[in-house]
Amino acid sequence: VIIIAVLFLTACQLIATASYARSERKHPDLRLSSRNSKLSKRCLGSRELCVRDTSCCSMSCTNNICF
């Protein structure tokens, strides 16, 4: 019974991996755009409008202004 369960889980994993790889080949532009958006993120400089501390280079957002 354990052997059957392991074989079943392995087969499910292989099927999921194959469908993910197929999806990436069909839509390479989506993969590139998500990769580019991660690379183009930057922090906000001093006196720029902010929403949270993590968006500021100084990690200090007070009254929606980076310090």
Curated annotation (Swiss-Prot):
One of its GO terms (molecular function) is ion channel inhibitor activity. One of its GO terms (cellular component) is extracellular region. Disulfide bonds join C43-C57, C50-C61, C56-C66. Expressed by the venom duct. The keyword DNA damage does not apply. Residues 18-40 form a propeptide. Keywords: Cleavage on pair of basic residues, Disulfide bond, Knottin, Secreted, Signal, Toxin. Pfam families: Conotoxin. Residues 1-17 form the signal peptide. Coiled coil: none annotated. InterPro entries: Conotoxin. It is found in: Secreted. The keyword Signal applies. The presence of a 'disulfide through disulfide knot' structurally defines this protein as a knottin. Belongs to the conotoxin O1 superfamily. This is Conotoxin AbVIO. It comes from Conus abbreviatus (Abbreviated cone).
